[in-house]
UniProtKB/Swiss-Prot annotation:
Keywords recorded for this protein, A-Z: Cell inner membrane, Cell membrane, Membrane, NAD, Quinone, Translocase, Transport, Ubiquinone
Coiled-coil boundaries: none
Cysteine pairings via disulfide bonds: none
Compartments where located: Cell inner membrane
Subunit structure: NDH-1 is composed of 14 different subunits. Subunits NuoB, C, D, E, F, and G constitute the peripheral sector of the complex.
Function as written in the Swiss-Prot or TrEMBL entry: NDH-1 shuttles electrons from NADH, via FMN and iron-sulfur (Fe-S) centers, to quinones in the respiratory chain. The immediate electron acceptor for the enzyme in this species is believed to be ubiquinone. Couples the redox reaction to proton translocation (for every two electrons transferred, four hydrogen ions are translocated across the cytoplasmic membrane), and thus conserves the redox energy in a proton gradient.
Family: Belongs to the complex I 30 kDa subunit family.
Catalytic activity: a quinone + NADH + 5 H(+)(in) = a quinol + NAD(+) + 4 H(+)(out)
Protein name as annotated: NADH-quinone oxidoreductase subunit C
Listed GO MF terms: NADH dehydrogenase (ubiquinone) activity; NADH:ubiquinone reductase (non-electrogenic) activity; quinone binding
Species assigned in the record: Bordetella petrii (strain ATCC BAA-461 / DSM 12804 / CCUG 43448)
Record Pfam families: Complex1_30kDa
Length: 209
């Protein structure tokens, strides 16, 4: 029986990395969960193994799972395919031009207070600015990156704006000061507004009648 392309990729991944790898399939796509201490070794294997040949990283981003589940998670859901889940994750999307298939690879930064994973720049040089963006927006540190500095926010920006606990109004704002004849920074003057609608529902709301 002929295997589908997805089945072939799954077979090749297990052959290269071991049968007990943390692999999930959803919506016709494979996601490989990798512990942070194996991140560099596994990604290098994905690129160099002839049966995989993921020579291109087309995207890399950070994710903040601070409010994931909103308290509804069940026991055991702190792990994904056997890999320990934490607040911050790094997700890479890989492409094999030779085999015409794709793979999503995710790792979890073990320390929520100082999230850090290894840089993939030696494996795929094109992730340089992707990792800088994840550092800028999420505060994820990529160990070994040769030029890890902000890339989107302004000089002197405080905080990381894509974190779930970053205030929507920010922390500082800038304006032109006519007396100093230059643009200055000052604490944000926007008053936060929280509007909670008052909803009155019947006791039987949503139940079949």
């Amino acid at each position: 029986m002929t295997m589908t392309r997805l089945e072939t990729l799954k077979h090749n991944l297990q052959a290269a990395l071991g049968a007990d790898i943390a692999l999930t399939e959803a919506l016709g796509e494979l996601t490989l969960e990798v512990p942070a201490d194996q991140w560099l070794a596994v990604c290098n294997k994905l690129r160099t193994d002839a049966g995989l040949s993921f020579e291109t990283c087309i995207d890399l981003c950070g994710v903040d799972y601070l409010t994931w589940g909103n308290g509804t998670r069940q026991a055991g859901e702190d792990k994904v395919a056997g890999v320990q889940r934490s607040r911050y994750a790094v997700v890479a999307h890989l492409l094999s031009i030779a085999h015409n298939w794709r793979l999503r690879v995710r790792t979890w930064a073990p320390d929520d207070d100082f999230p850090m994973v290894g840089s993939l720049i030696d494996c795929w040089p094109g992730v340089n600015w992707f990792e800088r963006e994840a550092f800028d927006l999420f505060g994820i540190v990529f160990e070994g990156h040769p030029d890890l500095r902000r890339i989107l926010t302004d000089y002197g920006f405080i905080g990381h704006p894509f974190r779930k606990d970053f205030p929507l109004s920010g922390t500082v704002e800038m304006r032109y000061d006519p007396e100093q004849r230059r643009v200055i920074y000052q604490p944000v003057t926007i008053d936060p507004r929280e509007i909670t609608p008052r909803v009155v529902r019947e006791d039987s709301y949503g139940l079949g009648r």
